[in-house]
UniProtKB/Swiss-Prot annotation:
CDD domains: DHOase_IIa. Pathway: Pyrimidine metabolism; UMP biosynthesis via de novo pathway; (S)-dihydroorotate from bicarbonate: step 3/3. Binds 2 Zn(2+) ions per subunit. Substrate binds at H62, L63, R64, N94, N278, H309, F323, G324. The keyword Nucleotide-binding does not apply. It is an enzyme of class 3 (hydrolase). It comes from Anoxybacillus flavithermus (strain DSM 21510 / WK1). This is Dihydroorotase. It comes from the Bacteria. Keywords: Hydrolase, Metal-binding, Pyrimidine biosynthesis, Zinc. Pfam families: Amidohydro_1. One of its GO terms (biological process) is purine nucleobase catabolic process. The active site is at D305. Belongs to the metallo-dependent hydrolases superfamily. DHOase family. Class I DHOase subfamily.
Length: 428
C-alpha cells in the first residue's frame, strides 16, 4: 500500500513553485509526477495546492528530559517540532543526568524511541556533567548512539580540554558543537552590554565574550582538523572570524537563530524575561551582520535554540529568570513573513537554511524532496495570516518574545516516514 499526496506545490531546482503529486511507500518517496494513478489499496490525500517543503532539520533543541519534565518532555517537544514542520531535531545534553556515559545515552535513545513524534538525534556532552574538567568516553558514547558532542548551555572554558576534545572527535570524524562564552567576560550579565542595559542599569554581556571563544576554537580546529560548529552566532566580530576561517580552509560551520535575525536589543520593550536568551539580543549592527553572513554563506543555516521554561520561572524578572525562549512552532512563519515576503531572501533560500543545509552540514539523511529520499516533509499554508498565540503552543514552554506577531506560512500537516505525525485541527 502506498500513499499519494495530490496537488502539492513544491520548489524545483530553479526555485519556482510547480504543482505535482508525491507517492510514498515504505517510508520513502517513490515517485514525484503529475496526475499519479492510485491503485485500489492506495491512500490518497489531497493537499489542495498547498506548499510542500522537505521536513525541517533543527540541530539545536532543548527537550529538557530527563530531569526537567516540568519545562518540556521528549513527547511534548517533538510534538512542537512536528507542529512547526521539523521532522528531525537534535537534543541538547544539558539535562539531569547529562548523557555523559554509555548507560545514560542508551537510556535516552530508548526513551526517544518510545515517546518521540519526530526523529531525534541525541547529543552527548563533551565533558563529564558538563563541568568542563574531564572528557567523556567519546568512543563509547558514539557506539551508544551519540550524534555529536557539545556542552551547550555552557562554554568549554579550558583550551586544553577543548583541544583534546577536538582531537578525539576528529579521530571519530564527529563534530564538536560549541556554545561560545568566556565566563570571565560575562560579568554575570542578563542582556547585551548595550543601550538596553544602560537604560535599566543592568549588567551587560559584551560581544567579545562570544567572539574570543570562537577565535580560540578556530585555531584549535585548524590544529586538529576537527569539524567545529558554532552555536547561535550573535555578533559581527564572530561572523568576521568564521568568514576568515572558512576562507582559510578551516572546517568551521555556524548557525543563527530566528530571534537573532529578527530582533536586536533596541526591540526589548520592558524588563520582560521573554526577551532574555543566551547569547542575548545584540545591536542593530550585529543583527545586520548576521543577515549578511547568512546570505553570503558565512553562516550555514538556521537553528531555533528552542529552550522552554515555565511561566513561573520567566516571571522572576530579567535578572533572575533563566535564559531561553521557545522557537520550534514559530520559526518558519516568522522567517517566511519577515524575510521572504519582504524580499530579504527567496523561499528556496529559507527552505534550504531550515532543511538541506543543516542536513548537509551534519551528514543527516534528510532535508530533500526527491525520489528515494525519506518521506519526511511538511505541508504549509503560505497565505492565511494568523497571530502568534503562546496559549496555542503544544510545547510546555510559552516563553516567546513574538506573542501577537501576525504571520503567514503556517504548517498544516507534517509527515515523517510517510506517516502524518501532526495535522492542523486534529488532536489540538
Amino acid at each position: 500500500m502506498a500513499t499519494i499526496f495530490k496537488r502539492v506545490r513544491l520548489l524545483n531546482e530553479q526555485g519556482e513553485l510547480i504543482q505535482t503529486d508525491i507517492k510514498v511507500a515504505g517510508g520513502r518517496i517513490v515517485q514525484i509526477a503529475h496526475d499519479l494513478h492510485a491503485e485500489a489499496d492506495d491512500e490518497v490525500i489531497d493537499v489542495d495546492g498547498q506548499f510542500v517543503a522537505p521536513g525541517f532539520v533543527d540541530v539545536h533543541v532543548h527537550l529538557r528530559e530527563p530531569g526537567g519534565e516540568h519545562k518540556e518532555t521528549i513527547a511534548t517537544g517533538t510534538l512542537a517540532a512536528a507542529k512547526g514542520g521539523f521532522t528531525t531535531i537534535a537534543a541538547m545534553p544539558n539535562t539531569k543526568p547529562v548523557p555523559d556515559t554509555k548507560q545514560h545515552m542508551e537510556w535516552l535513545v530508548n526513551r526517544i524511541r518510545e515517546t518521540a513524534h519526530v526523529r531525534v538525534l541525541p547529543y552527548a556532552s563533551i565533558t563529564v556533567r558538563q563541568a568542563g574538567k574531564q572528557l567523556v568516553d567519546f568512543v563509547a558514547l558514539k557506539e551508544a548512539g551519540a550524534f555529536a558532542f557539545t556542552d551547550d548551555g555552557v562554554g568549554v572554558q579550558s583550551a586544553r580540554i577543548m583541544y583534546e576534545a577536538m582531537q578525539q572527535a576528529a579521530a571519530l570524524d564527529m563534530p564538536i558543537v560549541a556554545h561560545c562564552e568566556d565566563e570571565t567576560l560575562t560579568y554575570k550579565g542578563c542582556v547585551h552590554d548595550g543601550s538596553f542595559a544602560k537604560r535599566y542599569g543592568l549588567s551587560g554581556i559584551p560581544s567579545v565574550c562570544e567572539s574570543v571563544h570562537i577565535a580560540r576554537d578556530v585555531l584549535l580546529a585548524e590544529a586538529t582538523g576537527c569539524h567545529y560548529h558554532v552555536c547561535h552566532i550573535s555578533t559581527k566580530q564572530s561572523v568576521r572570524i568564521v568568514r576568515e576561517a572558512k576562507q582559510a580552509g578551516i572546517r568551521v560551520t555556524a548557525e543563527v537563530t530566528p530571534h537573532h535575525l529578527l530582533l536586536c536589543d533596541e526591540d526589548i520593550p520592558t524588563l520582560d524575561a521573554n526577551f532574555k536568551m543566551n547569547p542575548p539580543l545584540r545591536t542593530k549592527e550585529d543583527q545586520q551582520a548576521l543577515i549578511e553572513g547568512l546570505l553570503d554563506g558565512t553562516i550555514d543555516f538556521i537553528a531555533t535554540d528552542h529552550a522552554p521554561h515555565t511561566k513561573e520561572e520567566k516571571s522572576e524578572g530579567m535578572v533572575l529568570a533563566p535564559f531561553g525562549i521557545v522557537g520550534l512552532e514559530t520559526a518558519f512563519p516568522l522567517l517566511y513573513t519577515h524575510f521572504v515576503e519582504k524580499g530579504i531572501c527567496t523561499l528556496k533560500q529559507l527552505v534550504d537554511w531550515l532543511s538541506k543545509k543543516p542536513a548537509e552540514t551534519f551528514r543527516i539523511d534528510g532535508g530533500e524532496l526527491k525520489v528515494g529520499a525519506k518521506a519526511d516533509f511538511v505541508v504549509i499554508d503560505l497565505h492565511t495570516e494568523q497571530a502568534i498565540d503562546p496559549n496555542t503552543f503544544v510545547s510546555k514552554g510559552k516563553n516567546t518574545p513574538f506573542a501577537g506577531w501576525t504571520c503567514k506560512g503556517w504548517p498544516t500537516m507534517t509527515i515523517v516516514a510517510g506517516k502524518i505525525v501532526w495535522q492542523k485541527g486534529r488532536g489540538e
